[in-house]
C-alpha cells in the first residue's frame, strides 16, 4: 500500500472507480475541483506521476475533465475497468496517482531497468498481473501442441521489452534453468535475437526482442498470440503462428432454450484459436456501451460457453436480439478476463415469424395446386355439397362460412396474445436490466465505503 505520509491530510486526494469509457477521459469530482483547483491555478494542463516510472505525464484539463494525454497514461499503466485510482494533489497542478486493483490492493509495477542491469542482478521484476496470467496459462496444456504456448500482450510487457514464459513449457523444453539464447520469428521469417532467463522463484521470462516483434506485427495491449518452438536449429526459435486479430469475431444465434437458461455455447474453433480455454469472469459490452459481467464455463465435453443467467437474456434484449436471430461479438481483450463487444445484429426472422411464413406458404401452395387442375374436395363431394350450398342460399349459414369466421376470430386472438406476450417480455427485460444496474451500483457503494475506511485508517497512522 502507499505509505501513510503520502496520503496524509495535508495532501488532498480523491479516488475514482474506473467504469466503461474511462480510457477516453476522466472527470475530477466536482467538489474537489471547486475547492482545490477552480480559480486557484492558471493553465489547462495537469501533471501526473506514479511509482511505475520516473516520467511525468502532461494531461490537458477541459473544465473538470482530464482529456488529451489521459489515454496514454492509462495505456502505460495498464489500467482496466474495475480498477480504482487515487489522485494525491501535491500542489501546483501536480498529482501523484496510485492504482488499485479490483481487490483494493495496490497494483505492483515492474521496475524500469535496462537489459544490462538485469544481467548483473540476474533478476527482472514483472507486474503481479503478468504473474497471475502466466500461472493461469499453465493449468491446461494437454489439449494443445506441446511445442506451442499462448501469450497475452500488455502495454507493460511491451514497454519493458520482456514477457513471461509458461513454466511448464520452459521445463518441458529445458529452458527453465539459467540463461538461454533464443530467436523470436514472425510468420514471414523476420527474426529478433532474444534470451530466456529464470530466477530463484522459478519464474521464466523472455528478455529482449519482444517490443520489436510486437511493433513489426502490429500486436498491441489486449491482443493474444501463439508461438511454436522450432528445435531444428542450434538456437531455439519461437515462431509466431497465430494472433487474435485473425478470428476475433464470433457469430452467435441464441435459441429460446439458451435465453431461458442463460447459457450460450461458443464455437470450439473460436475459443481454441483465441486461447479461451480457462473458466473465469467474462465481460460483454452492449451497443449502448453498458457492461455485463458473466461467466466463461467449461462443459463436460471440454467446450466453452457463456453463462449469465438472466443477464444473458437481458444482454440480448438490450441489443434487440431475439430467439433465432444472430449477433456478432468482437473479442477486444483476451487473457484472464476476456472482454467482448457487441458488433452487429444479423437480421433474420424469429422462430415464430418463420413458422408463420411456412404456414402461409403451405396455404398458398395448396391454392395453387387447386388452380392447376387437381380436383378440390368440393368437386369430389358433388351433389351433396350442391345441396348444402342451396340451403345456405336460403338463409342458413353453411359450415364453410362458419369455419371461415371462426378462423378469423382465432387469428385475432392469436395476434392479441402475441402483442401481450411481447409487452411482457419487454417489461421483463427492462426489469432485469434495472436489477443489474442496481446491483452494480450497490457493489460500487460497498467498494467506496471500503476505500473511505482505508483512508481513515491511514490518516490515523499519520
Curated annotation (Swiss-Prot):
Residues 11-103, 148-243, 249-346 bind DNA. Keywords: DNA-binding, Nucleus, Repeat, Transcription, Transcription regulation. The keyword tRNA processing does not apply. One of its GO terms (molecular function) is DNA binding. One of its GO terms (cellular component) is nucleus. Pfam families: B3 (PF02362). Residues 351-419 are annotated as: Disordered. Residues 399-418 have a biased composition (Polar residues). It is found in: Nucleus. Residues 369-397 have a biased composition (Basic and acidic residues). This is B3 domain-containing protein REM8. It comes from Arabidopsis thaliana. The lineage of its organism: Eukaryota, Viridiplantae, Streptophyta, Embryophyta, Tracheophyta.
